[in-house]
């Protein structure tokens, strides 16, 4: 028996962490592909192309409401273009400024069109985020209205407050700059754009999905997304400055470059969303007990039935705590939702919506793609000395198993037992 030493313990722990990281990265890549994030980024790119000017126009309109903020519109625009667009996209920023200035002179009908375009942009973003988090339905009614109204109205005003504060801090830096011999203030102001990006991405991951997202996960995801975004920005600017796009496209080079930049930006943002969603579910997925799909489905349906008796629903993480892997639950939930055995609430939780007295085990197995194959005896087996006896025994087993699989789930679960004897709901 090998003795444990600090070196072997460190090596074993390092290998465990490495395997955890490899599994987590594999899950992120698999989820990124399964959620069709590249396709979603393409659709959001075209939507952004149409909605950028309306969003800028709405921002100007909200600034004009408060006299103290009326002069901040151009400053905010320059700030966004400086820290969001690569350094080589001056043409795009100039075009967007001109388009926005012309849009502010539209009639009320044109203004309604701009607001609708901005609304559709936000709706499309929520739809793609809900798809990543596995939420079947987006916000509806008053919740939907309040969210988008807050973004379109309060968002620009909060940006104005932040910009006014930054102006004050800039003045403060000029005032005390001579006393900052260590250059601390200069370092702080150098990373202010990073902090703003971090806050924006974190808020995006927390507020947009129609489900509860842990703030600490959103903070980690927002930080990594900010780092990836800044790296992408630097790499993109370097590639453009060392390429011959202008020679090929001439005066039209700005448009394909802008589309490419927006598409890559959305790919980074959606990748960050996949990362945030995967943190908790990979941790839970480590408890995977490798249940067969039929047994896992029965386990989920049983707990959902017990939850319904209590007037409750079950969240996705509660279901994963039962011992299912993330991949297995995504596969089973798609089939159970498609057969209307379960349903998803507006909050993203799951409820049972099927009469268990009408659903048999064999039907459930067929729906989830695991129809039972009954044992049989082939010709070679019959020629063996014990072949005929085995055929009779296996035939009896076959009949008994067939009768068992024809049981309804209500009979299988014996749902008339006392509620107190039910296993506790996973917490």
UniProtKB/Swiss-Prot annotation:
UniProt entry tagged with the keyword Magnesium: no
Gene Ontology annotations for the cellular component aspect, listed alphabetically: plasma membrane
One Pfam match: Virul_fac_BrkB
Keyword Cell membrane assigned: yes
Compartment(s) where it occurs, according to its Swiss-Prot or TrEMBL record: Cell inner membrane
Membrane-related topology note: Multi-pass membrane protein
Record field: transmembrane: 49-69, 106-126, 145-165, 188-208, 220-240, 256-276
InterPro entries the record matches: UPF0761_bac (IPR023679), Virul_fac_BrkB (IPR017039)
Protein keywords: Cell inner membrane, Cell membrane, Membrane, Transmembrane, Transmembrane helix
NCBIfam families: yihY_not_rbn
Family of this protein: Belongs to the UPF0761 family.
Protein name: UPF0761 membrane protein CJA_2282
Provenance organism: Cellvibrio japonicus (strain Ueda107)
Lineage of the organism: Bacteria, Pseudomonadati, Pseudomonadota, Gammaproteobacteria, Cellvibrionales
């Amino acid at each position: 028996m090998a003795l444990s030493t600090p070196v072997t313990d460190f090596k074993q722990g390092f290998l465990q962490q490495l395997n955890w990281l490899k599994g987590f990265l594999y899950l992120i890549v698999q989820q990124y592909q399964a959620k069709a994030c590249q396709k979603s980024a393409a659709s959001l790119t075209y939507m952004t192309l149409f909605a950028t000017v309306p969003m800028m126009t709405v921002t100007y309109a909200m600034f004009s409401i408060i006299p103290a903020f009326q002069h901040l519109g151009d400053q905010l625009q320059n700030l966004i273009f400086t820290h969001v667009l690569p350094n080589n996209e001056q043409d795009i920023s100039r075009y967007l400024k001109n388009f926005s200035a012309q849009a502010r002179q539209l009639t009320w009908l044109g203004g309604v069109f701009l607001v609708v375009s901005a609304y559709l942009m936000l709706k499309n973003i929520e739809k793609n985020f809900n798809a990543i988090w596995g939420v079947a339905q987006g916000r509806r009614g008053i919740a939907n209205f309040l969210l988008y109204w807050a973004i379109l109205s309060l968002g620009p005003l909060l940006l104005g407050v932040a910009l006014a504060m930054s102006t004050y801090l800039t003045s403060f830096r000029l005032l005390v700059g001579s006393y900052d011999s260590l250059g601390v203030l200069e370092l702080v102001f150098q990373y202010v754009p990073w902090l703003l990006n971090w806050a924006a991405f974190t808020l995006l991951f927390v507020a947009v999905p129609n489900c509860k997202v842990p703030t600490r996960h959103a903070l980690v995801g927002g930080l990594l997304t900010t780092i990836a975004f800044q790296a992408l920005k630097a790499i993109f600017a370097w590639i453009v400055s060392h390429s011959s796009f202008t020679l090929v496209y001439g005066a039209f080079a700005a448009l394909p470059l802008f589309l490419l930049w927006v598409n890559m930006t959305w790919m980074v943002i959606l990748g960050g969303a996949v990362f945030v969603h995967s943190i908790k579910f990979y941790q839970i997925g480590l408890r995977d007990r490798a249940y067969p799909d039929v047994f896992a489905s029965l386990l989920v349906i049983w707990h959902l039935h017990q939850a319904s008796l209590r007037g409750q629903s079950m969240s996705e993480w509660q279901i994963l705590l039962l011992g299912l892997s993330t991949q297995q639950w995504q596969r089973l939930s798609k089939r159970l939702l498609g057969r209307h055995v379960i349903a998803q609430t507006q909050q993203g939780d799951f409820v049972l919506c099927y009469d268990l007295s009408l659903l048999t085990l064999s039907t459930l197995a067929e729906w989830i793609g695991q129809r039972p194959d009954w044992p049989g005896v082939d010709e070679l087996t019959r020629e063996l000395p014990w072949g005929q006896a085995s055929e009779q025994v296996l035939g009896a087993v076959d009949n008994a198993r067939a009768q068992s699989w024809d049981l309804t789930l209500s009979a299988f679960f014996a749902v008339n037992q006392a509620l107190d004897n039910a296993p506790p709901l996973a917490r």
